[in-house]
Amino acid sequence: MTRPMLEALDLAGVRGERRLFDHLTFRIVPGECLSVHGENGSGKTTLLRTLAGFATPAAGRVLWKGKPLRNQWSEYQRELVYNGHGIGLKEDLNALDNLLAAAAIAGEPVTTECVESALDEVGLAEHRHLPFRMLSQGQKRRASLARLLLYRRKLWILDEPSTALDQFGARWLGELIHRHQSRGGMVVLTSHQELALKTSQTVRMGA
């Protein structure tokens, strides 16, 4: 039996004084994708932030390789990519410099050639020197997702990664996630857009 890498044990989450979810338990092994569904305000983002270690659960625990996150915070962050609602890149920098700066902050040694290759894969090679503010929302989202190509991390936590993507972009994202799974990677995501995913588990919030 494959040992779980990420475990949520009897998790509860709150926002303000409102209880968003309670008694959530699941385990993720290499190669799995967990899809989180629910209405707006049901706690999907709170759950993802809790799994990433950015929010403290109201109850329960999150384990990585069988140990609590608080006991291995630095190691866990080196194995995680968290892509939130926001794009997370600077409007005044171009896409190339944005990704180089983001990689440096994340502690990922990448070359300019690697970043250019990632931008080419997401269809932004010709726009790599444009100020980020001049790109469309879909192009900005693709630039943000290009980080997944640069960071060799086991776990991807993606909050609405298909936002602003067209049909081509959504199909590319589904293929990218499938490749990550085939290499033993793990994914936790929320998405309002249907993606062609090999989903192993589903969590329904507010059910």
Swiss-Prot record:
Gene3D superfamilies cross-referenced by the UniProt entry: P-loop containing nucleotide triphosphate hydrolases
Keyword ATP-binding: yes
Cited Pfam families: ABC_tran
Phosphoprotein in keyword set: no
Binding site for ATP: 38-45
Residue stretches making up the ABC transporter domain: 6-207
Catalytic reaction annotation: heme b(in) + ATP + H2O = heme b(out) + ADP + phosphate + H(+)
Molecular function GO terms recorded: ABC-type heme transporter activity; ATP binding; ATP hydrolysis activity
Membrane-related topology note: Peripheral membrane protein
InterPro entries in the record: AAA+_ATPase, ABC_transporter-like_ATP-bd, ABC_transporter-like_CS, ABC_transptr_haem_export_CcmA, P-loop_NTPase
GO annotation, biological process: cytochrome complex assembly
SMART domains linked to this entry: AAA (SM00382)
Gene Ontology cellular component annotations, sorted alphabetically: plasma membrane
Enzyme class, broadest EC rank: translocase
Oligomer and partners: The complex is composed of two ATP-binding proteins (CcmA) and two transmembrane proteins (CcmB).
Name the record gives this protein: Cytochrome c biogenesis ATP-binding export protein CcmA 1
Protein species of origin: Cupriavidus metallidurans (strain ATCC 43123 / DSM 2839 / NBRC 102507 / CH34) (Ralstonia metallidurans)
